[in-house]
């Protein structure tokens, strides 16, 4: 830990540690009524599925507390793309081109959230629904 200027803490105490980013990468529902009150970060961005115990309630509360939330399926997009690429024998270059678009999607979600004053989970759901609707009409 000292090599990276980090501090090891008990997992039960993690929510009360001052940090920039909380990255839940294993267990879902770690953002709940109890932990959200303790959370001391400005960003939640992790690979765990279903990080918010109650998406609407906790997503809205994080917005009120000015905590930026990167939805799980946005963070997981690279892994999903890689699986798809393996099945369809895409080249490394093709996979990287697909993955580079995650940044653009993240920016789009954050901008929509800000413009419409809605939580990022809702902005990402709206964008996903629009894309699925567009694809289904093809």
Residue map of PLM features:
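Rossmann-like adenosine-cofactor binding region
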Residues: 1-71
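Adenosine-phosphate binding glycine-rich loop
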Residues: 42-138
């Amino acid at each position: 830990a000292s090599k990276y200027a980090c501090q090891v803490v008990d997992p039960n105490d993690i929510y009360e540690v001052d940090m920039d980013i909380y990255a839940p990468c294993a267990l879902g529902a770690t953002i709940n009524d109890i932990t959200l009150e303790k959370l001391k970060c400005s960003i939640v961005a992790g690979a765990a599925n279903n990080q918010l115990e109650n998406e609407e309630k906790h997503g809205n509360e994080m917005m009120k507390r000015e905590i930026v939330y990167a939805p799980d399926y946005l963070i997981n997009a690279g892994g999903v793309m890689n699986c798809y690429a393996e099945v369809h024998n895409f080249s490394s270059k093709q996979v990287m081109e697909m993955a580079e678009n995650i940044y653009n999607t993240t920016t789009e979600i954050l901008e929509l959230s800000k413009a419409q004053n809605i939580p990022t989970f809702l902005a990402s759901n709206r964008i996903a629904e629009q894309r699925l609707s567009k694809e289904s009409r093809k």
